[in-house]
C-alpha cells in the first residue's frame, strides 16, 4: 500500500528536475528549424529583386494567392512590376520557392502574423523585399 505512493513520488521528483518543455512565449522566443516555412521574402541581387516574372510561382501555387505582373526595363529584361502574396489564402506549402528558376523567393523563419486589418495580410513587393 505504501509502495505505489513511493513510486508515484519518485516519478514526481524525477520530473521536477527535468528541463521544462514549455516556453513562456512572449518572453522566450522559439528558434525555428532551418526547414521551417514562415513568411515569404524576395531576394535582392545588385540592388533589385531577383524575380524575372516567369509566372511559375503563381502557376504552381495550390491556393492561388500569388499575383505577378511583368514589366520590362531599358535593357528589355523582364522584372516583376507588381508582386503580391495574399497571406490569408497562403497555405505555406513552399511550392513557389521550389518552382523558382532564379532562386528569387525564400521562406523566412518569421511566424508572427497577427494584424488588425485584412489589408495588412496582402504583402506587396516592397514589403516582401524588407524581410531578411
Curated annotation (Swiss-Prot):
InterPro entries: 4Fe4S_Fe-S-bd, 4Fe4S_Fe_S_CS, NADH_quinone_OxRdtase_chainI. Residues 42-71, 81-110 form the 4Fe-4S ferredoxin-type domain. It catalyses: a quinone + NADH + 5 H(+)(in) = a quinol + NAD(+) + 4 H(+)(out). GO terms for molecular function: 4 iron, 4 sulfur cluster binding; iron ion binding; NADH:ubiquinone reductase (non-electrogenic) activity; quinone binding. Binds 2 [4Fe-4S] clusters per subunit. [4Fe-4S] cluster 2 binds at residues 61, 90, 93, 96. It is a peripheral membrane protein. It is found in: Cell inner membrane. Disulfide bonds: none annotated. Keywords: 4Fe-4S, Cell inner membrane, Cell membrane, Iron, Iron-sulfur, Membrane, Metal-binding, NAD, Quinone, Repeat, Translocase, Ubiquinone. Its EC number is 7.1.1.-. Pfam families: Fer4. The keyword NAD applies. Transmembrane segments: none annotated. It comes from the Bacteria. [4Fe-4S] cluster 1 binds at residues 51, 54, 57, 100. Belongs to the complex I 23 kDa subunit family. NDH-1 is composed of 14 different subunits. Subunits NuoA, H, J, K, L, M, N constitute the membrane sector of the complex. NDH-1 shuttles electrons from NADH, via FMN and iron-sulfur (Fe-S) centers, to quinones in the respiratory chain. The immediate electron acceptor for the enzyme in this species is believed to be ubiquinone. Couples the redox reaction to proton translocation (for every two electrons transferred, four hydrogen ions are translocated across the cytoplasmic membrane), and thus conserves the redox energy in a proton gradient. This is NADH-quinone oxidoreductase subunit I 1.
